[in-house]
Regions:
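A short beta-strand-loop-beta hairpin characteristic of the jelly-roll/cupin
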Residues: 58, 63-64, 69-90
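Short, Lys/Arg- and Gly-enriched loop/turn segments at beta-strand edges
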Residues: 34, 87, 103-109
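Conserved short histidine dyad/triad with adjacent acidic residue
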Residues: 15, 27-36, 46-64, 99-102, ...
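A short hydrophobic beta-strand segment most commonly corresponding to one strand
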Residues: 95-100, 110-123
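Short acidic-glycine-tyrosine-enriched beta hairpin
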Residues: 52-53, 82-100
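Short acidic, Pro/Gly- and aromatic-enriched capping/linker segments at domain boundaries
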Residues: 2-15
Length: 123
């Protein structure tokens, strides 16, 4: 039997040597475990935060308060970094926020819609 590797995309937001935030696309490998599906290795976490963000959310330059995964459940999140690049994260998308220092990023609601998300802290 051939095992099929699956991958799940995570977008990393981190501070580069230039003290600017950057995006990096990562792929988390998952192993085929048959009937239960594909699973990744365990990733240690410290807490889970449930969050609702209002439709007018517009948070100017800031850094992530700690290393954390942000999982979008409903709605969308627009993240802008220093070079003007925007990425929009929608339901099912995962971001690993690690830009703890430097200029940081801007976060905004998309299309005047509220957002529900999970913050899964790592530190």
């Amino acid at each position: 039997m051939t095992t099929i590797k699956r991958r799940m995309r995570v977008t990393r937001l981190y501070t580069g040597a230039d003290q600017q935030s950057h995006f990096e696309d990562l792929e988390i490998e998952m192993d085929d475990l048959g009937l239960i599906g594909h699973l990744s290795a365990r990733h240690p976490v410290t807490s889970l935060i449930f969050r609702h963000t209002d439709a007018d959310y517009d948070y100017s330059w800031h850094n992530a308060p700690q290393r954390q995964y942000i999982v979008i459940l409903e709605g969308s999140l627009d993240v802008e970094i220093g070079d003007g690049t925007h990425r929009v994260f929608g339901a099912g998308d995962i971001m690993l926020a690690e830009d703890l220092t430097g200029q940081g990023h801007i976060s905004r609601a998309v299309d005047g819609q509220p957002r529900r998300s999970l913050f899964i802290t790592l530190d």
